[in-house]
């Protein structure tokens, strides 16, 4: 597990670690990966490789169970709180929600996500992201969320919009995606804004 990092206003304090499990609703749970999940995670990625490759730049780095095992170990030992949750629907692994980065100095974090092709369009990602965001704002006391996606990745953009994030900007040629540059868009929301929005729903 990563070691806690002190809050900026009190270097001796320790923020809480992300929970190892988050219940979303009946049958939908988020679990931090363990080494025993490596094979199932690789199979899920491999079966959806063509589908995911359209917008995710890391597929060529995942070619074996050992690659996934190394990733799980790296996250476990990461001191900067890179963190992922496996999305399980009645036990079946269907995707991932990840804390791609956490900036403890400014109490902000970035969120990423993907879901298998057969599980897309069912609201699974939106519900899962909402649960992780609540955990980060309420339990981890973070202040600002950023989601950055490819400008033409309309399903991922729709997730950010459904979650109530605002569009803050467009970056030209932000990412090299296998054979081309792609623009990205950045969405964001702060904890106070999230609380107002949640209270209204």
Give the location of each predicted region.
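Acyl-donor (CoA/ACP) binding surface of acyl/acetyltransferases
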Residues: 1-40, 44-51, 86-201
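A short helix-loop-beta-strand connector motif used in the catalytic cores of GNAT acetyltransferases and
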Residues: 72-86
């Amino acid at each position: 597990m990563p070691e806690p990092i002190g809050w900026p206003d009190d270097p001796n304090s320790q923020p809480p670690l992300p929970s190892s499990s988050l219940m979303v609703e009946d049958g939908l749970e988020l679990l931090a990966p363990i080494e025993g999940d490596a094979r199932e995670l690789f199979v899920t990625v491999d079966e959806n490789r063509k589908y995911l490759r359209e917008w995710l730049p890391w597929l060529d780095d995942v070619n074996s169970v050992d690659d996934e095992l190394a990733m799980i170990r790296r996250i476990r030992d990461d001191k900067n709180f890179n963190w992922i949750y496996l999305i399980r629907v009645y036990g079946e692994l269907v995707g991932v929600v990840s804390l791609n980065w956490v900036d403890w100095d400014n109490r902000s974090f970035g969120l990423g996500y993907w879901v298998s092709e057969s599980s897309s369009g069912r609201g699974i990602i939106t519900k899962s992201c909402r649960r992780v965001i609540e955990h980060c704002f309420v339990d981890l006391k973070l202040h600002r969320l950023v989601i950055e996606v490819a400008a033409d990745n309309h399903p991922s953009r729709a997730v950010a919009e459904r979650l109530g994030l605002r569009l803050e900007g467009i970056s030209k040629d932000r990412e090299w995606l296998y054979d081309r540059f792609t623009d990205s868009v950045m969405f964001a929301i702060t904890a106070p804004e999230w609380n107002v929005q949640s209270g209204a729903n």
